[in-house]
């Protein structure tokens, strides 16, 4: 597989896949899904550059973008990454905001147990997270 946890793809294999006529390519460059361990080695920019060169500047996808340091994200974008998935980060901020709402007892006040109220802080936290990521990724006001 091309994007298993921490694996690094072969640029020649990426070229063969790109030559099939796909629109985007998600290739492993040391990225993983979920939370990154403290001893994570980071993204392999040398391989990313070779993949970008081999695939003719095809838009690349970075799975497991949550938790990758901003500078690494910027470097990946400069080397052809056009789409970055950050689902884990959104899930974590949603859970944290919802947990805070409940721990503060707001679900016990009035109709605070209404799912629309109970889940609203999590929804707002996701919106804030996505806006921050859009700014980091340079995708604000882009189609």
Label each region the model flagged:
Residues 1-2:
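Short, small-residue-biased leader/transition segments that mark boundaries at the very start
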Residues 5-17:
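Active-site glycine-rich loop that binds ribose-phosphate moieties when present
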Residues 8, 19-20, 40-62:
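Alpha-helix-loop-beta-strand connector modules within alpha/beta enzyme cores
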Residues 23-26, 59-61, 83:
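Structural preference for beta-strand elements that scaffold enzyme active sites
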Residues 29-36, 79-97:
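Glycine-rich phosphate-binding active-site loops on the catalytic face of alpha/beta enzymes
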Residues 34-52, 69-73, 92-101:
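Active-site-adjacent beta->alpha loops and helix N-cap segments on the catalytic face
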Residues 60, 65-81:
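Catalytic cores of alpha/beta
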Residues 102-143:
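Extended, intrinsically disordered, low-complexity segments
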């Amino acid at each position: 597989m091309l994007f298993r946890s921490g694996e690094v793809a072969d640029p020649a294999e990426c070229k063969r896949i790109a030559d099939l006529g796909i629109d985007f390519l998600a290739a492993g460059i040391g990225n993983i899904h979920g939370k990154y361990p403290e001893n994570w080695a980071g993204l392999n920019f040398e391989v990313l550059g070779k993949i970008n060169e081999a695939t003719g500047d095809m838009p690349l996808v970075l799975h497991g973008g949550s938790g990758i340091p901003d500078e690494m994200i910027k470097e990946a974008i400069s080397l052809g990454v056009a789409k970055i998935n950050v689902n884990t980060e959104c899930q974590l901020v949603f859970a944290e905001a919802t947990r805070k709402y409940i721990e503060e007892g707001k679900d016990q006040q009035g109709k605070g147990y209404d799912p629309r109220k109970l889940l609203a802080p999590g929804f707002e936290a996701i919106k804030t997270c996505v806006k921050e990521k859009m700014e980091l990724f340079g995708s604000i006001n882009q189609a």
